[in-house]
Amino acid sequence: MATVEEEESAKKKKSHGILKLYYGMTEEGKAAERHLEPTDVDGVHFNPELYLTKLRKESSLSQLMDVEADMVRQIRSLDSEMQTLVYENYNKFISATDTIRKMKNDFKKMEDEMDGLASNMAVITEFSARISSTLQVSHQQITKLSGVHTLLRKLQFLFELPARLKKCIELGAYGQAVSYHSKARSVLHQYQHMPSFHGIQTDCQAIMAGLADTLRQRFRDPASSPQELSECVEMLLNLEEPAHLLCDEFLAHGRGRLASHLSDLQESGDILEFVDRGCGGFISDACLLAASYQSLFSKEPGNSAQMAEAKLTVFLEELSTGYFELVEKRLHQEKSLGDNSLLVRALDRFHRRLQAPSKLVPGCGFNRRGTEIVVRAAQERLAQYLQSLKEFFQGCLTDVRQALAAPRLPGKETSGLGDLLAGLSASVLNQIKTVLAAVHLFTAKDVAFSNKAYFKGEFCSQGVREGLIVAFITSVCQTARQFCEIPGEKGTSTPPSLLLLLSRLCLDYETSTISYILTLTDEQFLGQDRSPVTPVSSLCSLARSTAQTLLNQFVKYQGLVVSQMLRKSVETRDWVTTIEPRNVRAVMKRVVEDITGVDVQVGLLYEEGARKAHSSDSSKRTFSVYSSSRLQGRYAQSYTPSAPMDTNLLSNIQKLFSERIDIFSSVQFNKVSILTGIIKISLKTFLECVRLRTFGRYGLQQIQVDCHYLQLYLWRFVSDENLVHCLLDEVVGSAAHRCLDPAPMEQSVIEVICERG
């Protein structure tokens, strides 16, 4: 009784576990369920009495009705799900039952078949045993008769052999004849002492000698195909002809065919077509010849195979030398840089086709020599691209010079230099990128020779980076420096605006372009070479030095242009007998106009730069030498016998305490410094010219007017107005020193004349 109850309890727990598994209740929730209250409907320890008691105490009638309705709904839902689960399991059970019934039927059929097979095997075993016992008596006799039959067939073959050989030769089946003779040769040689066999051997030797003569004639026929040659050599070798003689004749015949391919390659054509013809003709026939040669002679016993291989290696090296010379000569003729992919494809195809003969005959070095040719072609192409970049840069400079010399439309004079610089820089940079893209084809992954050590290392670092990019940047700097030569030395003068533009170009290269180009190159050509390369800082220093040299030359040139006007204006005038000044001389106005034009021109390419603080009214500033009272007090003493001190000494003492002005010092890369350098050169020339002339009263006054006019306009261009003030002060002072009658003009009159001018 207890056992029945335990079974029913186990069945309930099992069904309860299945339901929990169906509703997604895991084992992890058991621990939590143990702690639930007895009033939890879903709990394991649910107590209906406690639940109803609690529900009646805590809920109203309407709530009880709602709970009842909800519970009825849940019961119906659970009942529906339970029915669905039962139906699904029932269907699966029915399907499993059908499957088991079908398997039982199949196994029963297989058992019947196995029984039949076992009975058949037993019958076969019985028959085999009876046959073996029956034949056991006559087995030795049958074996003996079979041996006799085989011997008779061989003897019949030997007696019929001469007739068979003649028949095969008449039908042209030379290979069959050689095969028959090869089978019987050892037997005839073994039994040649017997008269019957000796006669057969003599007849066969005579027949095969005639066949050998026929094969030699065919072998020496130039019209024979490679397949016919191979067949002839193979048959002659089977006829025991000397192998070394056949090697020489075989190679001599092949030499003529390969030489004809080399003569066909002399005709010019497209580089890709040239390589295709060479590979399809010479290389293909060389491979076919080598393969046929090795299949014929490499199986010879003793040292014959080594001798044959050595002859083949020497033969291919001689002919391949001529082929490689033709290829290299044709590559030298490839000067067009328009489509580099054509050359790379040709080199790739050339390199790929050399792999076959290299594997067939490793000793001839096809692969090594082909790689050397590809490397030299790549190096030559880099040199061509470097030269093309140089020529492109020269062409750009020629275009810039023509643009600078051409007249400009009104209103567009100011934007010329900036546009030219941008166009020049962009054109050169784009050309460099184009060249890098073309050269990068040599290292493409689909190119066979790109995995060679040279193209992974030295080509990237020493070839492209150093030999192309660094060399071109150096060439740009050298070309720019050539414009710093003395104007007219080569018969043509360099436009000063070109010097200014090139200086800015080199400065831009120093600040950003060089780093960008080298970074782009290093990213595209990730070489594995560890050889030293030119650092970026060295190229930047070279570019900055070139920019400084060009800018110094520009300042010197513009300063000399203005100085030339001032020098002529001083040297061509009679300063002693000149009339009283009424206007500013035209040359001074021209000087101011030219310097203003240079200021505008420089401002298009360079930044303003730093200036020292100006005085409140620099244009109205009066220098000590401009003051008539100072001039009278300063220089009248030189004409008075009781002068307590020489005025020259006073002037020299004053110069000791003035700041030294370096006229030809290097300028900085800004507009103020450039204009300051030009004005220093101009005013210093003006000063030196004044020191060499003699002035009258009105000549001194004209110098005063001119210097005041220059002061009105030039102070705004320089970094320190005191520099202009000091130089002009010295000009007026020198004119006063050289004046025969130093009577300076009143400052107010000077200002009126300058304002009116």
UniProtKB/Swiss-Prot annotation:
<dbReference type="GO" id="GO:0016020">
    <property type="term" value="C:membrane"/>
</dbReference>
<feature type="coiled-coil region">
    <location>
        <begin position="371"/>
        <end position="392"/>
    </location>
</feature>
<dbReference type="Pfam" id="PF15469">
    <property type="entry name" value="Sec5"/>
</dbReference>
<keyword id="KW-0813">Transport</keyword>
<dbReference type="GO" id="GO:0007030">
    <property type="term" value="P:Golgi organization"/>
</dbReference>
<keyword id="KW-0653">Protein transport</keyword>
<dbReference type="GO" id="GO:0006869">
    <property type="term" value="P:lipid transport"/>
</dbReference>
<feature type="coiled-coil region">
    <location>
        <begin position="94"/>
        <end position="124"/>
    </location>
</feature>
<dbReference type="GO" id="GO:0005829">
    <property type="term" value="C:cytosol"/>
</dbReference>
<dbReference type="GO" id="GO:0042147">
    <property type="term" value="P:retrograde transport, endosome to Golgi"/>
</dbReference>
<dbReference type="GO" id="GO:0007041">
    <property type="term" value="P:lysosomal transport"/>
</dbReference>
<comment type="subunit">
    <text>Component of the Golgi-associated retrograde protein (GARP) complex Component of the endosome-associated retrograde protein (EARP) complex.</text>
</comment>
<dbReference type="InterPro" id="IPR016159">
    <property type="entry name" value="Cullin_repeat-like_dom_sf"/>
</dbReference>
<protein>
    <recommendedName>
        <fullName>Vacuolar protein sorting-associated protein 51 homolog</fullName>
    </recommendedName>
</protein>
<comment type="similarity">
    <text>Belongs to the VPS51 family.</text>
</comment>
<dbReference type="GO" id="GO:0015031">
    <property type="term" value="P:protein transport"/>
</dbReference>
<keyword id="KW-0445">Lipid transport</keyword>
<dbReference type="GO" id="GO:0055037">
    <property type="term" value="C:recycling endosome"/>
</dbReference>
<dbReference type="GO" id="GO:1990745">
    <property type="term" value="C:EARP complex"/>
</dbReference>
<dbReference type="GO" id="GO:0000938">
    <property type="term" value="C:GARP complex"/>
</dbReference>
<dbReference type="InterPro" id="IPR039481">
    <property type="entry name" value="EXOC2/Sec5_N_dom"/>
</dbReference>
<dbReference type="GO" id="GO:0048193">
    <property type="term" value="P:Golgi vesicle transport"/>
</dbReference>
<keyword id="KW-0333">Golgi apparatus</keyword>
<dbReference type="GO" id="GO:0032456">
    <property type="term" value="P:endocytic recycling"/>
</dbReference>
<comment type="function">
    <text>Involved in retrograde transport from early and late endosomes to the late Golgi. The GARP complex is required for the maintenance of protein retrieval from endosomes to the TGN, acid hydrolase sorting, lysosome function, endosomal cholesterol traffic and autophagy. Acts as a component of the EARP complex that is involved in endocytic recycling.</text>
</comment>
<keyword id="KW-0967">Endosome</keyword>
<keyword id="KW-0175">Coiled coil</keyword>
<dbReference type="InterPro" id="IPR014812">
    <property type="entry name" value="Vps51"/>
</dbReference>
